[in-house]
Amino acid sequence: MATRGNVPAHMQASLPALPAHLQSDTHITAHLASRFHVSLPTARLSSQGLICLNTFTSSTRGPNGDKEGSAMGEPEDLARRAWARLGNRAEDQAFGFFGESGSGKTTVRSHLLSSFLSFSSTPLSSKLSLAAFVFDTLTTTKTTTTQTASKAGLFYELQYDASSNNPTLIGGKLLDHRFERSRISHVPTGERSFHVLYYLLAGTSAAEKSHLGLDGHVNITTAGTGLSRSASVSHKRWRYLGHPTQMKVGINDAEGFQHFKNALRKLEFPRTEIAEICQVLAAILHIGQLEFGTGQATLTAAEESGGYSHEGGETVTVVKNRDTLAIVAAFLGLGVQDLEESLRYKTRTIHRERVTVMLDTKGARENADELATTLYSLLVTYIIESINQRVCAAEDSVANTISIVDFPGFADHSSTGSVLDQLLNNAANESLYNTCLHSIFEKTAEMLESEEVSVPATSYFDNSDAVRGLLKHGNGLLAILDDQTRRGRTDVQFLESLRKRFENKNKAITVGSATSTMPGSNFATTNLAASFTVRHYAGEVDYPVHSLVEENGDVVSGDLMNMIKATKSDFVANLFGQEALNTVSHPAEKTAIVQAQVSSKPLRMPSVSRKKHDQLRRMASRRADRSPAPQEEEPLPGTEEAKVRRTKPTATGLTQGAAAQFLSALDNITKSLTAPNVNNYFVFCLKPNDRRIANQFDSKCVRQQVQMFGIAEISQRLRTADFTIFLPFGEFLGLTNADGGVVGSDREKAQLVLDSKHWPPNEARIGNTGVFLSERCWASIALTGSQAAAYFGGDIGSPSRPDTPGHNPFSDSKARLVGSADGTPGSFYGDEAKGGGYFGSRELDAKSDAGASAFHSGDMFRNLETKEELAEKGNKKKVEEVDVVPVSSSRKRWLAIVYFLTWYLPDFAIKWIGGMKRKDVRTAWREKFAINLLIWLSCGLVVFFIIVFPELICPKQNVYSAAELSAHDGKGKHSAYVAIRGQVFDLGAFMPNHYPKIIPQSSLKKYAGVDATGLFPVQVSALCQGKDGRVDPTVQLDYTATNISGTAAVISSTDANRKYHDFRYFTNDSRPDWFYEQMIMLKANYRKGSIGYTPQYVKTLAKKSKSIAILNDRVYDFTTYNEGGRSVRAPPGEEVPSGVDTDFMDSLVVDLFTQRAGHDVTKYWNALPLDPGLRSRMQLCLDNLFFVGVTDTRNSPRCLFARYILLAVSILLCSVIGFKFFAALQFGGKNVPENLDKFVICQVPAYTEDEDSLRRAIDSAARMRYDDKRKLLIVVCDGMIIGQGNDRPTPRIVLDILGVSETVDPEPLSFESLGEGMKQHNMGKVYSGLYEVQGHIVPFMVVVKVGKPSEVSRPGNRGKRDSQMVIMRFLHRVHYNLPMSPLELEMHHQIRNIIGVNPTFYEFMLQIDADTVVAPDSATRMVSAFLRDTRLIGVCGETSLSNAKSSFITMMQVYEYYISHNLTKAFESLFGSVTCVPGCFTMYRIRAAETGKPLFVSKEIIQDYSEIRVDTLHMKNLLHLGEDRYLTTLLLKYHSKYKTKYIFHAHAWTIAPDSWKVFMSQRRRWINSTVHNLIELIPLQQLCGFCCFSMRFVVFLDLLSTVVAPVTVAYIAYLIVLLATESDVVPLTAFILLGAIYGLQAIIFILRRKWEMIGWMIVYILAMPVFSLGLPLYAFWHMDDFSWGNTRLVRGEHGKQILLSDEGKFGPDSIPKKKWEEYQAELWDAQTQRDDARSELSGYSYGTKSYLPTGSVYGGGYNDTQHLMMAPSRSASQLDMHPTPMYGGGGGHNQSRMSLAPSEMLGSQSNLMMPSGRSVADMEMSDLTGLPTDDMLLNEIRDILRTADLMTVTKKGIKQELERRFNVNLDMKRAYIGSATEAILSGQL
């Protein structure tokens, strides 16, 4: 239409109405600009399309301030027109939206939806509006271009019942198409994750935040710096929420959360379910906060495996913030340990094998991200499906639909890094755009052509090439991607598939090169940036293929599914029980979920319109179905067909990848949009500029979008053909009320009507059967009254909503995108108060509003389970099986002791404070505590014995003999002591304080070391009260008249200085108390002790007529008193009074000391008839006047015993070490053993070791200088696990080392394992072959424990002990001829038939660890030792460290390893009882040499060592900590007549822990295992020796030394202190003896020229406190550090224990067993029945029942292969030198060699050659009656074997030749022929 009159050009809203010269991109852009600048941001593409520009301001304001012409008004107008067509024509209406991110597409879509819902203002329309809000809340985000970016494909369907021209809304349906899942874990810079996560964080109350764990302070580690800081949650950086600034971008998150909860409530979600939804959202946020680090799994578990380097615990990834982990576990209803275990491991399917990968920190983080993504995906699906269940109408009641299709905008790059999301969304846009082009160009042209109407052709960009290349079924790009995913192909293979498909075949897709050549290199390498390019309608996009195939798999690991099975949360269980989660079950066990996949397509499909009325069918009857060729119909979700398709297995287990599912969903959309009765509208949303500036129009930016969408071409097309309605002539004439009187055909009548209407030719044309009209023309004739007014008159009669500027999403300016003013992504749907928006009118659903307001006003989790209750519930184990087990009497006695020692610790305290919920764990803790108490008591007793006990026997005496006193003479470094009246004082300390000061110290020092009693005369009357209480002051007593000490060091009474201390009564200066006062002062400050007299010396003095005796251990001397020492003196000038009694001592006392001189008179003293007063006075006189010293008992027997007890202990210890020293010296030089012919098995258990370690171990075993034919290398792989740092599972690494091709894939077979419940049923695979390394060709067998199909995490893993038991139990059953499991039968078959050795021939088993390297001569030396001593059952060699210098931790262990072997084990070897032969390097005797009686595999050993119920502390320490030591214990226990020895000539090197934590854990295990095993050994009666020379004494000594090891450090420290404080020779001697220990050790390594051990010894001595103090204390306290598994004991009735397990109950009958003879007979039958034409017999497998080489890399050990059963990679030239038969012959060399297993060496040739040169096939058979006798057969067999080639002859061939010779069928004699052949070949006949 041209612009009329003075109407401005910009007022023309319809672009096709512009003149033809204005139809270019530039002119259309200019026209849009002119409208944009007058606030008209919209334009029309006639009636078929709408163009909206984002103004970044209000979307509701047009040029006149109202909504007309605005981004809100035009969609309303479009909705009214579509509504009119829906009501009047009963057509389905569909709207397709196009636009880049930031173009306002989501906003326009919301206005359109709101308009339709406003036409039906019912509670249902309100719910549908809320449903759209919930969808957007879950799937929209803020990007750099808009605050409301849709990140999920939406197909929103409104359902109507067309009962009248005003259709009734009866339902709705939300179909979500794969939201951008990668955004959950990878939020792009400057963008946000999905809005609901921010809503939750901002909108919850304080109580709710507390429940959800979103409050409080946390430590944040800054990326890159590693620095931690404390921050509150409001500023906390949430990994899944992007940068913290994204929480403050103008969006009202808090209000959004309230709207979200309100919407769910109005959608009838229960309150508890909304709370659960919030908990899952919180759990997702917390998963993002999990921090992973590398730690050591030091808790001991039964499944542990590996060598010495693993014994301290394997390196695992751990969660550092356990509190956050606990929150996640609580909300998911899981146990914390289970969740952590699931995050650190991931099970994948590699080459049809399930393999568990031990993840590093990066892998664990990705695994956690996968969990979060899966949770959010399932939550979104669950909420949408729940909404659909509430609002969707029944399919058969739906007459018409209105569909809104909106996919995320086209993207030329992926902001989150997900190429798959980018590819699928762009493919969806491509498909939708192609539908648009088809609808406007092709569909119209087809209709016109069918009616023979011609219109001018219009050129346009056809994207069909891109659509076909991307979306074509079978060989489109998405189909190829999905096919490659299902086939398990790599990215490079996918790229090559694209190249074959598209190169030079589709110009829209270009495939890049998979290889690239680096500059300066001539060699092509893998192109890490390989990509393919798609030419989209919007431009070319490069898609990198890296990880695209894996991402398309979209696999949810089986570990996660297995973990969720145990959830206690019904809601979480429902999430994972949805149909959207496609599970893949194991083909062999349907209950085992191997993996799963979250569907990328909606659970529902677009509704199929039901044509219930004739009016609805009128158009369909006349319009041809021109829809595309039908594809394979997609089954309806939920139907049986869908389920069958969903579970169809493929190479990877997946039925469809994300691409195929998305493609299927796109097909459904395309079918829906192109259905015959659907009218399509297309809305093109454009952004005016790239900088989000309001009211700014960038012509270049807009022109690019106009070109991209082809708007100019569409407009030109509509200028020539704007036809959307076809009316048959009758219907057209009826609508126009044409004059019935006009004569002519309907066509002529219609032509007259058209002529009268003057409609332009591009809007009205006549065809053969009807009239083509535009929508405008149709409306002018079909609509009347209010409908016409509404259609043409804008707002007339419109129920649309008035303008609400307060809640407009465009109301912001430059900085805002299309979003809401208040930041709520839902509020652009209108103001809730005004109705018509998401939340509708307030008067609707008032009850729901009330409920919702009450719901969000406080705490939504009120009256629900608390976080702690959820955690306890999640950690609680499910009990499945109950078993009653008896309690032994010894166990009862021990528990009685335990409770006696720990009764004061209440059970509830252990339960709540210690966190031990399980009764058996608490019991173990009590046992541990009781054992620690006993150990501490033992240590205390040792300390008491060493330190306290000697003091009790001989208390320390501070006495000095005369000689000792004289030594303290102050000369040199000697101290200065002096004696006064039996008391010794420190003269050196006193001299500075002597008064007066003028006396020089040199004068005082001359008294040092002497008895200075003579210097101090005493006043008798002041110191003694005499017989009657008083002594005359004139009485004097001369004390110094006699030298009683027997030395010259006595000061006489003539000393010049005596006068200065003489203050007696007769002097001028009488001070009676002066001496007493001075003695009090000296005793208080300077006393050192007393003069000591031995009893012997007292007797000696008595013999010299001295009146000296001992009273109460004090020595008194009456010699002076008796020999005239008494006198009477008065002061000068006074007369001596007469009658003075000088006998102041009672005569009885004097007589006692005179008559009993030299003796102890204590008992006589006590017997004296003295009254108490007199006795007291006599005692006072004795102490003050006659005391000369105390009894010196230091040399008494009692004190000598106490004195030498330390020396005795040292001598005892040194004697043991001395014995060890001589034991170490008793070995002679190395002897070169002879060549040996014994068969040896070398077993290597493998777990998660790296390839280098495994190769070193396997190569060292293969290179041992021992006859290769008599060695069998058996590797047992413990589970399908990829260790950290490995790129393949351990079994694959082992098989690659041994040269086994990946094509060899034997069937897994059942066998018994050590495990709880159903874990006892395990499955394994057997491989065998020959391994060549450095000239050695060694037969090998690999047993891979793969686990049952139901095992998801770490399948097959049961631990190292179980790996040992696989071989031990097999040999046990071989030797006892017991029924075997399928795996054991296969092992027997491989060894006997393939390798060619009877398993009973093997006599010894060498066990080495996978991280151990053995010396070449080790096996030879060990076997030699066995042959020299037939009573030897176990031999170990010397193990050294191969990583000695890795760290200080390993350096500490070098010397300890050396002496533990060369001293300890050598010493125990003297007794023939090495208590621990280490499992890393030990050889065992399998059977007795003479009798063949099983030893190592005897019944008792197997029974005890295979104990499954390991539920007590003692049993766990025995079987889980040190299985090798316990195995040695069992050997000594049950085979007491046999010996275990140590041979230092056999060497091996192992890897020791190099980190402190692992070292501590390893030694904890060793120490505790040692204690518990020695406790087992001590009661044994069979240990050799007598008394202290018995092994029991050595065992007890070892146990004691282990228990009291901490005291040894204290003992040495005590000796050092004694040596430093005393010069006594005893501690010095003891210390010298202990020092000699290391001297003896030094002699050993000097004699052996181990000079480097000097340095290692120093390091070891420095580390002594660690080994002897730190490690034992740590070990004893951590004795109960175990992984307690899922089986626990509780106390039942009558003293029994009830065994509770959640692992199920194992039935032994579930594993079939049969004897070898039965199995052998089956083999023979299978061989006989085989087709004669078969040229080669391969191993007949128990598992496969086929002739395929089960597990063997060669086709059988007894055929005529020239290459001796080598792996395919082996060349013949390598073997032709010595074609050693393995072991049945040399192939083409025709050597007559008998097999070591004659019964099975016979192979099968299709034509056994006879002496005559003819073959069996040439012989004719005739029927004869009667059979030949056995003798006749025997003779003929001998004749045949004499001339036949034994390398190719078979039993069957012999039977055939016999039948030829006797001309009779010999099936009846088959058994005899076989046994006779065996007997002849073995020499028995």
Curated annotation (Swiss-Prot):
UniProt superkingdom? Eukaryota
Query: What one GO molecular function would you report for this record?
Result: cytoskeletal motor activity
Residues in domain Myosin motor?
1-789
Membrane-traversing stretches: 894-914, 929-949, 1205-1225, 1599-1619, 1626-1646, 1653-1673
* Induction line: The expression level increases quickly and almost doubles when cells were shifted to 37 degrees Celsius, compared to cells maintained at 25 degrees Celsius. Expression is also increased under additional stress conditions that are known to initiate development of the sclerotic morphology (acidic conditions or Ca(2+) limitation induced by EGTA) or of hyphae (induced by nitrogen limitation). At least one negative regulator binding sequence exists in the promoter between -880 and -680 bp and another regulatory binding site is localized between bp -680 and -450 bp.
Its membrane topology is listed as:
Multi-pass membrane protein
What does the record give as the reaction this protein catalyses?
Answer: [(1->4)-N-acetyl-beta-D-glucosaminyl](n) + UDP-N-acetyl-alpha-D-glucosamine = [(1->4)-N-acetyl-beta-D-glucosaminyl](n+1) + UDP + H(+)
What is this enzyme's EC?
A: 2.4.1.16
Its PTM note reads: Maximal activity requires trypsin activation, suggesting a zymogenic nature.
The record's InterPro entries line, in alphabetical order, gives: Chitin_synth, Cyt_B5-like_heme/steroid-bd, Cyt_B5-like_heme/steroid_sf, DEK_C, Kinesin_motor_dom_sf, Myosin_head_motor_dom-like, MYSc_Myo17, Nucleotide-diphossugar_trans
Cellular localisation = Cell membrane; Membrane
Which residue ranges does the record assign to the Cytochrome b5 heme-binding domain? 957-1016
Region Disordered: start-end pairs: 601-649, 794-817
Where is this chain glycosylated?
Answer: N219, N429, N668, N1043, N1068, N1462, N1568, N1759, N1790
Q: Does the keyword Signal apply?
A: no
* SMART domains to which the protein is assigned, alphabetical: Cyt-b5, MYSc
Query: What GO terms fall under cellular component here?
Result: cell septum; myosin complex; plasma membrane
List the effects observed when the gene is inactivated: Leads to hyperpigmentation and loss of viability in stationary phase at 37 degrees Celsius. Reduces the virulence in a mouse model of acute infection. Causes cell wall integrity defects and subsequent abnormal yeast morphology at 37 degrees Celsius. Does dot lead to compensation by increased expression of another chitin synthase genes.
DEK-C domain boundaries: 1827-1882
Give the region (Actin-binding) as residue ranges: 666-690
> Mind listing the UniProt keywords for this protein, alphabetically?
Actin-binding, ATP-binding, Cell membrane, Glycoprotein, Glycosyltransferase, Membrane, Motor protein, Myosin, Nucleotide-binding, Transferase, Transmembrane, Transmembrane helix, Virulence, Zymogen
Q: Do you know which PROSITE patterns this protein is assigned to?
A: CYTOCHROME_B5_2, DEK_C, MYOSIN_MOTOR
Family of the protein in this entry: In the N-terminal section; belongs to the TRAFAC class myosin-kinesin ATPase superfamily. Myosin family.
What exactly does this protein do? Answer: Polymerizes chitin, a structural polymer of the cell wall and septum, by transferring the sugar moiety of UDP-GlcNAc to the non-reducing end of the growing chitin polymer. CHS5 is required for the sustained growth at 37 degrees Celsius and is of critical importance for virulence. Especially important at infection temperatures for maintaining the cell wall integrity of developing yeast buds, elongating tips of hyphae, and random sites of expansion in sclerotic forms.
Name of the protein in question: Chitin synthase 5
- In its UniProt entry, the species of origin is given as Exophiala dermatitidis
Please name the gene that encodes this protein: CHS5
